Swiss-Prot record:
It comes from Leptospira borgpetersenii serovar Hardjo-bovis (strain JB197). NCBIfam families: glyS_dimeric, PRK04173.1. It is found in: Cytoplasm. It holds the Pfam family tRNA-synt_2b. GO terms for biological process: glycyl-tRNA aminoacylation. This is Glycine--tRNA ligase. It catalyses: tRNA(Gly) + glycine + ATP = glycyl-tRNA(Gly) + AMP + diphosphate. GO terms for molecular function: ATP binding; glycine-tRNA ligase activity; protein dimerization activity. The gene is glyQS. It comes from the Bacteria.
Length: 464
């Protein structure tokens, strides 16, 4: 039986509302689960779709200099040799000899000695610190039972082929970026794009994390929204600055994340990825502390040069204006969809005490990303209120995901929608049958307003 991973206490309220209201479920739950796997429920998948569509709108559709791509998860294994992932995509691993628990050494040391302590430490130095401090195992409590730290490759390996004789060892991709680099030449040829331009995609990636934890923040299966922006060498710093600012503005102005919950952190030289000349993270203040949300990296010409070398293909760009050929430099904004999901739920979550002493839990999502835009309630299930409510519901469905609910007391229906994050609730009552108006209740202020049915859709459209 696989060990259950303990839940960070700071996340319990977030996890509770996500499970209770159908945002996130434990994976394979009826079979006892599988650690660090999650399924997104009806409201979770709506929130994810809204976030992805909003990203695609502002990073592809509203830009003349970016196009889209959907590359394969399974790639020729030579791709990962060329990219450096086979030899360099590792984390330091230690084992407890007593209970067999596997631990990521650098994160363990930072838990013991403070954030940033392990930055730049070699395996030898990590081993020295662990021995000198005689740390106890966080699982069994025994001291002095750790193995020597060693590199652990994070890529999932599988077989490609129907029989052992002709099967090929391949990997599930650990990032979506390489599929973009492989198609750089195809995109230039078929779209006639001129540098500077970007290629964006949304897709699943897989990393065999040693310590997958903190709910959906660090999972072995995750989704990325990545873009590789190709530019002329010497202009990458200007574009790097552009994308850091563009990404930050998108989070605050479009998604609605509070500015005080975001910060930009520049990587130290010792913590840079093997392909990067400079990286800045947009970090979010999660319940467990600051964590990477969005990484913007200057990947130079590393990837295209490596694929030229290993494949034999000429991946240089022919600049017709300057009449010269060069390998473009690349700036990469890479955003984890699951981390963004956790960030917006955390940012929106609030508990407030009402005048009657009741505690109200509410998710204050921006209307742009709210999984349900409007909920329609008949006050009673009789006297024509159901029919009128259904008529209004059908008319409003053109605005997006609209929910209909005729079960339970109105107050409880309001509370349920508060926890889902629905911006507006509409109650159809007996006055509706008299004067064709409804009560519209706003989520954050709980203020109520009578609005005529004839102008209801436009009234909501202006606010969603």
């Amino acid at each position: 039986m696989e060990k259950k991973e303990s839940l960070d206490s700071s996340l319990k309220e977030i996890v509770s509302v996500c499970k209770r209201r159908g945002f996130v479920y434990p994976g394979s739950e009826i079979y006892g689960g599988l650690s660090n796997t999650f399924d997104y429920g009806p409201y979770g998948v709506e929130l994810l779709q809204n976030l992805k569509q909003l990203w695609w709108k502002f990073f592809v559709h509203l830009r003349e200099d970016v196009v889209g791509l959907d590359s394969s998860i399974l790639l020729n294994p030579k791709v990962w040799e060329a990219s450096g992932h086979v030899s360099n995509f590792t984390d330091p691993l230690i084992d407890c000899k007593n209970c067999k628990t596997r631990i990521r050494a650098d994160k363990f040391l930072e838990d013991q000695k403070g954030e940033g302590f392990a930055t730049g430490l070699t395996l030898e130095k990590m081993n020295q610190v662990i021995k000198e401090n005689n740390f106890s195992c966080p699982n069994c409590g025994q001291r002095g039972t750790f193995t020597e730290a060693r590199d652990f490759n994070l890529m999932f390996k599988t077989s490609h082929g129907a029989s052992a004789e002709d099967s090929l060892d391949i990997y599930l991709r650990p990032e979506t970026a390489q599929g973009i680099f492989l198609n750089f030449k195809n995109v230039v040829s078929t779209t006639r794009r001129k540098i500077p331009f970007g290629i964006a995609q949304i897709g699943k990636s897989f990393r065999n994390e040693i310590m997958a934890r903190q709910f959906v923040f660090r999972t072995r299966e995750f989704e990325q929204m990545e873009m590789e922006f190709f530019c002329e060498p010497g202009t990458q710093k200007e574009w790097f600055s552009h994308w850091v600012n563009y990404c930050m503005n998108w989070l605050t102005e479009q998604v609605g994340v509070k500015k005080e919950n975001l910060r930009i952190r520049e990587h130290e030289k010792e913590e840079l990825s093997f392909y990067s000349e400079g990286t800045s993270d947009i970090e979010f203040k999660y319940n467990f502390g600051w964590g990477e949300l969005w990484g913007i990296a200057s990947r130079t010409d590393y990837d295209l040069n490596q694929h030229q070398k290993f494949s034999g293909e000429d991946l240089k760009y022919q600049d017709q204006v300057q009449n010269k050929k060069y390998v473009p430099f690349v700036v990469e904004p890479a955003l984890g969809v699951n981390r963004l999901f956790l960030a917006v739920v955390t940012d929106a979550y609030q508990e407030e005490k009402l005048p009657d002493g009741e505690i109200r839990t509410v998710l204050r999502f921006s209307p742009k990303i709210a999984p349900v835009k409007v909920a329609v309630f008949p006050l009673m299930k009789k006297d024509g209120l159901l029919e009128k409510s259904r008529e209004i519901f059908a008319d409003l469905s053109k605005l997006g995901n609209i929910e209909y609910d005729d079960s339970g007391a109105i107050g409880k229906r309001y509370r349920r929608q508060d926890e889902i994050g629905t911006p507006f609730c509409i109650t159809v009552d007996y006055d509706t049958l008299k004067d064709d108006t409804v009560t519209v209740r706003e989520r954050d202020s709980m203020a109520q307003e009578r609005v005529s049915v004839t102008r209801l859709r436009n009234w909501l459209f202006e606010r969603l």
